Structures are given as structure tokens and as C-alpha cells.
């Protein structure tokens, strides 16, 4: 299998900060396998996230909680191999950093060593700042995540809009400042009001990457299966479908089946 080569320079944590300073928006997308990541990397995507959304997209689970660190490393290793340009981030799965900072550091080191990614991402604000600092002190870039934090879905009773009232908005802003001071290289803001996400982005030096957070963040991220039209029935307000890969694949597999059953594939030119 051959691929086009890319001469684009490797994006790093420092590059992301420079992009924010220059006013250049950051485009991030998820990927979970080598082939998909290679396509995105060659297209010039700025960053690829191996999200724990792999639990839903790749494993068919109802939420992100079941996926293990071994499964995350498996997917992350494949994606990292594919990327020569994109900044590659791996989610730390539920249970890999919540117990204490020492365990968080050990698992972050394991992910970096075994997968070859550029950074790890974990959810939470003030409650994880000590762990974030410890991981960064170990030499590992960290991406933060505030707002809708899917690993806490049971705590909040669903996937609704976060920081809707003044108290929640104040806490989110304060948490963002704490993570900024701790040294995160980027901060995901998920499903929060646009005005709040814009204000957070203005008040911190860290690049913000939004999903359902409006246009005022320093970048955007989407789950690729949703953005490329591969999933059905999931149509939140923030989602735009940029392709209809599901239809392409359905049409393609239909044509393949017809040709096999009609005995028109393979033909003589396709046989040895």
C-alpha cells in the first residue's frame, strides 16, 4: 500500500502556542488506525487525537468508560506510526489517572513509551492539577479538557451543555487558569457557551480547542466518524458533516457484491 509523502514540518507543543499567537486556527480530528491517520496527516491536519471515543466508534460501547489503557495504546501506536506532520495526542482513559498523581504519571509514561505519541490528554480542572503538574514534570506534554467531560457522564447525568450558570462558568474559567498556569500545551473546551469559551481563550495563553464551544476558541476538534458522515443518528447542534463516507462505502460494497455474484469480478485482466 503506497502513500504520498509530505514535506510539512512536524507540529509540536511549541508550534501550537505559536499558532495561537499568530492567530492561526488549529484543526484537530480524531483517528484510531494507521490508514485513516495517514490520510489525515498527508492532508495536512494540524493535530490528531486518539480519543477515548474509540470506545464508542471502534468498540461499540455506549460511553467512553470501558476502554482500557492497553486498548488506547494499541490505537495510539498505529496512529503515531502514520504521522510525520500532525501533533498526536492520546487520551488517558478512565481509571488511569484518577486514583493519585503517581499512578497518573506511571500511566502517562507508559502511553508515551509504548505508543510514540506527542502528548497525553486528561479531563478535569482543579481536581487534576496536581497530576497534570506531575506528568509535565516528567517531561510529558499534557492537553487539558474542561466543560463536558465524557468520563464523568454518570456524575452529571448525561451529555448536556456545561457551564450554563454563573457559578459553573466561573469555576470553568478558574479551572482553565489553573491548567494554564500548570503548563498544559492545549485545552479542549467541550459543549460550553460560545461567549464563555471565547472569554477563556482570551484570558489564557494556552491554545484552546473547541468542540461545541463556538468559533471563539483557538481551534476545533471533531470525531472523524461524525464529521465524515460515517455514523447515523448522532446530530448534535455543533456537528457539521463534511463528507458522506457512509454512502460511498455502502455504494462501493454494493457494487462489489453485485460483481462477485454476477461473476464479473475478477475478470481475466484481474487474474494471474
Region roles according to the model:
Residues 2-272:
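Alpha/beta enzyme core
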